[in-house]
Curated annotation (Swiss-Prot):
GO terms for molecular function: N-acyltransferase activity. The gene is lnt. Its main location: membrane. It is an enzyme of class 2 (transferase). Catalyzes the phospholipid dependent N-acylation of the N-terminal cysteine of apolipoprotein, the last step in lipoprotein maturation. It is found in: Cell inner membrane. Belongs to the CN hydrolase family. Apolipoprotein N-acyltransferase subfamily. Its EC number is 2.3.1.269. Pathway: Protein modification; lipoprotein biosynthesis (N-acyl transfer). Residues 230-470 form the CN hydrolase domain. The chain crosses the membrane at residues 7-29, 58-78, 90-110, 125-145, 163-183, 192-212, 482-502. One of its GO terms (cellular component) is plasma membrane. This is Apolipoprotein N-acyltransferase. Keywords: Acyltransferase, Cell inner membrane, Cell membrane, Membrane, Transferase, Transmembrane, Transmembrane helix.
Length: 511
């Protein structure tokens, strides 16, 4: 087995396969032990490698993880971006090769500055800290790509009880720590005290997760709200067709009008496929309908802002009519889907760079939440729900979470189910109910433990009815966010860095 930790292709190919295990630990497969196995193989494969070899070992791991785990990007480019098979494949390979460096650079840093092969416990802790730092960096760099976090594998796993304490971050940290400790345990057997401490570090977090699973961190803030969510199942090729606007508006109106005994009616992202000011008459009429039902109607709609120079800016928005108020403008935009980086260079090259409604502006920070039926509703439009810290900031001010999306871009791939799993994790982190309304699935209601209690199957038009309970109180994660865990990771990385620089006789303090 020593070949695993040696430079060269055998180890690189194993790293590629180990990375490809990542999506199997997540939705829709949910074989969560594979997250530990995947990271353990990477950790073992980096042992003893020099910096350059470690960089490529990490790159191959990342190529496997993103190549298998974000294969839905090919669907978006080919099926909806009108790119040919060769071009879509080339763009997908280029994207995967680029994001694989998210793992390559930390692997190089690990080999050059942090790894201490003679200190099994300290090495495992530092590796887990570096893994956490990597996931944090991925959520921020170039607007972020916080996909395929190891911690999502624990949505309903043994570590689910730790998620309200430290978010998906804590789950990822424990998984990485467990992977490294399992690799290092054989080296601890001759040392009784170190072995005991290693077992405590390995088993303690899992025991704590099981103990806290199901603990109620929040409590009811009022009577249940009766919810109706509409899943229109509009084909993407019809979505922005001007000739189909009236049919879409009529569809959502006709599905909503018969609904009785309802507090909230929710439509998906851009369910109203024309600008808010152009749809003012329609929205006003639907607001009157909602008022007559003593309900609030919440819908996705693009919003235009006219500027002083006569130009306009466009936003992806959510608005409330009826017994509620507020319009929210999306802050976290999808590259190429909602805006085009370097658009002066890329616009017009291929159809993928000229998708409909791909010129949105970013909404301002610190927007007020939506209000409906007397409660504060935290809104997340599509991609925004995958950002843990961003979502937590809004959730802490709210009693109910709401996410609207159009996952038609993913086709029949695993993308929509990965997206749903991340939404479920936001509910678990915050201890709040979440309403999820999508164009073609999965529309559902999620309880404060991240469980789906009602849903409409994908690719079907349907009406979901159910209840959500407004919640109050803050989970530890909403109170303190990632900062305590990030501080711990910083200390562990500094500890490893200092331990690496000391003379051998001084390293015992840091081992």
């Amino acid at each position: 087995m020593r070949w695993i930790s040696r430079p060269g292709w055998p180890g690189h190919l194993l790293a590629l396969a180990a990375g490809a295990l990542t999506p199997l630990a997540l939705a829709p497969f949910d074989y969560w032990p594979l997250a530990i196995l995947s990271i353990a193989l990477l950790y073992l494969g980096l042992r003893g490698l020099p910096g350059k070899s470690a960089l490529w070992r990490g790159w191959w791991y990342g190529f496997g993880a993103f190549g298998a785990g974000t294969s839905w990007i090919y669907v978006s480019i080919h099926d909806y971006g009108a790119a040919s098979v060769p071009l879509a494949s080339l763009l997908m390979l280029g994207f995967t090769a680029g994001v694989a460096f998210f793992f390559a650079l930390p692997a190089w840093l690990w080999a050059r500055c942090l790894r201490r092969d003679n200190a099994p416990l300290g090495d495992a802790l530092a590796f887990a800290a570096l893994w956490l730092a990597l996931e944090l960096f991925r959520s921020w760099f170039l607007t972020g790509f916080p996909w395929l976090y190891a911690g999502y594998s624990q949505l309903q796993g043994p570590l689910a009880g730790l998620v309200p304490v430290g978010g998906v971050w804590l789950s990822s940290f424990v998984i990485a720590l467990s992977a490294a400790l399992l690799v290092n345990l054989p080296r601890l057997f001759p040392h009784g005290a170190s072995l005991l401490l290693g077992l405590v570090l390995l088993l303690g977090p899992w025991a704590a997760g099981l103990y806290l699973k199901g603990h109620a961190w929040t409590h009811s803030a009022g009577e249940p709200l009766r919810v109706v969510a509409i899943q229109g199942n509009i084909a993407q090729e019809l979505k922005w067709d001007p000739n189909q606007v009236r049919a879409q508006l009529d569809l959502y109106r006709d599905l909503s009008l018969p609904q009785q005994d309802v507090d909230l009616i929710v439509w998906p992202e851009t369910a109203v496929p024309i600008l808010q000011d152009m749809a003012s008459g329609y929205l006003g009429a639907m607001g009157q309908v909602a008022d007559e039902k003593n309900a609030a109607l919440i819908t996705g709609v693009p919003v235009r802002e006219r500027l002083a120079d006569g130009k306009s800016r466009y936003f992806n928005g959510i608005t409330v009519v009826g017994e509620g108020a507020g319009t929210y403008l999306k802050q976290k935009l999808v590259p190429f889907g909602e805006y085009v980086p370097l658009q002066d260079l890329l616009r017009g090259l291929i159809a993928f760079f000229d998708l409909p409604m791909s010129d949105f502006a970013r909404g301002p920070a610190d927007q007020p939440l939506l209000k409906a039926k007397g409660y504060q509703i935290a809104p997340y439009i599509c991609y925004e729900v995958v950002y843990p810290e961003f979502a937590a900031a809004l959730a802490a001010q709210s009693q109910v979470l709401l996410t609207v999306s159009n996952d038609t871009w993913f086709g029949t791939s695993i993308g929509p189910l990965q997206h749903l799993q991340m939404a479920q994790m936001r509910a678990l982190e915050s201890g709040r109910w979440m309403i999820r309304a999508t164009n073609n699935g999965v529309t559902g209601l999620i309880d404060p433990y991240g469980r789906i209690v009602r849903q409409i199957p994908q690719f079907q038009q349907g009406i979901l009815r159910g209840e959500v309970i407004p919640m109050q109180g803050l989970t530890p994660y909403l109170q303190y966010r990632v900062w305590p865990l990030a501080g711990l990771a910083g200390v562990l990385l500094l500890w490893a860095l200092l331990g690496r620089q000391l003379r051998p006789q001084e390293r015992r303090l840091f081992g």
